């Protein structure tokens, strides 16, 4: 439905690119995942590896799952966005992304790697995909005269999120 996507009359469209940049800075922190690999492999033995610690191989795959789910969700979420609008999709993205962190944190606390996969990989990946398409599709429609500049601002945030997300 077009009324879910197009700005109302009198709305300042230049308020959207900074908000899109902020959203993409948050979800772009996924690219800082490699910084968290070493600590995740030493949860029990902080200084030296313990027998109950996770090995690096399974921990690295969590990022891959999140990126695959991002792509799949973005493909499906784009069509869904056409029906319900970017606000609704953006709110669902925020809940998925935040919920993914909560479930993933629970998995770390309980030493259950499958919960980290489910939380950060699947649920967080869904938040990534929906959070990616919502601002970009809005900017493309609201800036037909400056599509490249408007979407570039948002995508810049996705790449810059790794700088902010890495401690």
Language-model features: locations:
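Helix-to-loop junctions at the C-terminal end of transmembrane segments
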Residues: 72-86
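Residue-level signature of mid-helix packing/kink "hotspots" within the transmembrane helices
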Residues: 31, 67-75, 163
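Glycine-rich segments within core transmembrane alpha-helices of 12-TM secondary carriers
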Residues: 144-166
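Extracellular/periplasmic helix-loop-helix junction of adjacent transmembrane segments
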Residues: 36-72
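Pair of pore-lining "gating" transmembrane helices in MFS-fold secondary transporters
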Residues: 11-32
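C-terminal ends and interior cores of transmembrane alpha-helices
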Residues: 95-109
């Amino acid at each position: 439905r077009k009324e879910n996507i197009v700005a109302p009359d009198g709305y300042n469209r230049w308020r959207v690119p900074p908000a899109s940049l902020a959203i993409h800075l948050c979800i772009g922190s996924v690219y800082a995942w490699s910084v968290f690999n070493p600590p995740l492999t030493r949860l029990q033995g902080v200084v030296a590896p313990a027998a109950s610690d996770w090995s690096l191989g399974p921990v690295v795959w969590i990022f891959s799952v999140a990126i695959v789910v991002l792509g799949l969700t973005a493909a499906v979420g784009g069509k869904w966005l056409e029906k319900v609008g970017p606000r609704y999709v953006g709110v669902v993205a925020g809940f998925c992304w935040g919920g993914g962190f909560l479930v993933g944190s629970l998995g770390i606390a309980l030493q259950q790697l499958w919960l980290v996969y489910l939380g950060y990989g699947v649920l967080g990946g869904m938040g990534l995909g929906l959070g990616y398409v919502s601002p970009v599709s809005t900017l493309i429609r609201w800036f037909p005269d400056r599509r490249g500049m408007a979407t570039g601002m948002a995508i810049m945030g996705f790449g810059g999120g790794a700088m902010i997300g890495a401690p």
